[in-house]
Every structure is written in structure tokens, then in C-alpha cells.
């Protein structure tokens, strides 16, 4: 049987810190920099956002290796192995990926979205009228 609980945000955060008999929690994360490290580090033992409590010496070793390697392909390979291990051991189940849509009137120019999905407003302006 599955029981879904709807909670106020403050209560959810408290439950997340001490899940008790809870088997599954919804959790989202937005990268603060453009690198797989922004997501993979979340599952390291001792990371403040490791709400799953996941611990793996192999995972830690793969992430440690990726941080020491200067060659981009080797670094990516170590990160892929870490990600595969994480998915195989299932402390996390990817359910959805957030997508944002942006609408702008035709007379606005300079509309740009950063690789992190944020609206870059620096160059927004009205097009010159002819």
C-alpha cells in the first residue's frame, strides 16, 4: 500500500531531515554551476544535501578520481561510472526534469536563457521602431 502525504513546506523539510518510517521523498535540485559535479556531489556521504543517506566507498572513489583528472574525457568517464553506480544502487529515482518555456512579444530583443535555465535580462530591450 502507498500513502501519499501532503505537507506544509516547513513540515516537509523537518520530515526530510528525519524521515522515520518514510520510504520515499520527493526532492528537487537545480544546478548552481554547469557541471555534472553539481548533481553527483549531492550523494556523497556527509554532503549537507544528501537527504537519501546514501553511502558508497566506490562512489566516493569515482568522484574523487573525477576531481583529480585533468583530461576532460577521463573525467567524464569517471563521472559516468559514478552516475551508473548511483542509478544501479537506487538511492534516487529520476522522475521528471523541469522544463521552462519563455514567451516574449516580437518587439522585445535580447531574450536569452542561460544554460542553467535562468532568464538573462541584461540585454533585454524594445526593438527600435521603424
Predicted regions span which residues?
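A local structural motif
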Residues: 1-7, 74
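Detector for C-terminal structural segments
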Residues: 10, 15-130
